[in-house]
């Protein structure tokens, strides 16, 4: 029995996971396998999931609400890099793979719900599911490209 099996809204959460941009291609047995590593977190508005500079990183699947990715300067100026909504992912996968600290923070903008798991476990799951790994890494690159384009536009 997984943590999700005990959740009072397990059916809704399973539906939301199946609609996630990265997870929607998983078959039922793979989704069940993934569920055993997931933790469901209900977040308050402005709750920090990941602090810039941290090495403790997780993979997030946004089930409900809005998250933001923000970077802070030494003089406490903040810039929002992106928002993630229901069906999106939020991750620091590239930093984790490079064994670097998180270059940004992730926080909830609204009350939100996420499914989360340590990036080490997520990477192991991806290694066992090559097609998923390919689509996930493509999504990470797409997001990074969008953020780069947005940042360049802001500074022109």
Located regions from the model:
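Hydrophobic residues at beta-strand termini and immediately following loops
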Residues: 41-43, 84, 117
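Cyclic nucleotide-binding regulatory domains
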Residues: 47-109, 143
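Alpha-helix N-cap and coil->helix boundary residues
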Residues: 26-29, 79, 135
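Cyclic nucleotide-binding regulatory module and flanking cytosolic helices
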Residues: 1-39, 95
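Polybasic "coupling" helices that flank or enter modular domains
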Residues: 107-156
């Amino acid at each position: 029995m997984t943590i999700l099996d005990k959740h009072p809204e397990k059916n809704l959460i399973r539906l939301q996971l199946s609609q996630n941009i990265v997870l929607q291609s998983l078959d039922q047995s793979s989704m069940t396998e993934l569920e055993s590593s997931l933790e469901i977190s209900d977040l308050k508005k402005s709750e920090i999931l990941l602090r810039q500079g941290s090495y403790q990183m997780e993979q997030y699947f946004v089930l409900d609400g809005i998250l933001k990715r923000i970077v802070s300067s030494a003089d406490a100026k903040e810039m929002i890099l992106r928002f993630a909504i229901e069906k999106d992912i939020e991750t620091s996968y590239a930093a984790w793979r490079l064994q670097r600290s998180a270059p940004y923070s992730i926080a909830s903008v609204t009350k939100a719900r996420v499914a989360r798991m340590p990036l080490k476990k997520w990477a192991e799951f991806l290694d066992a599911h090559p097609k998923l790994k390919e689509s996930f890494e493509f999504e990470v690159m797409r997001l990074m490209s969008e953020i780069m384009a947005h940042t360049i536009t802001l500074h022109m």
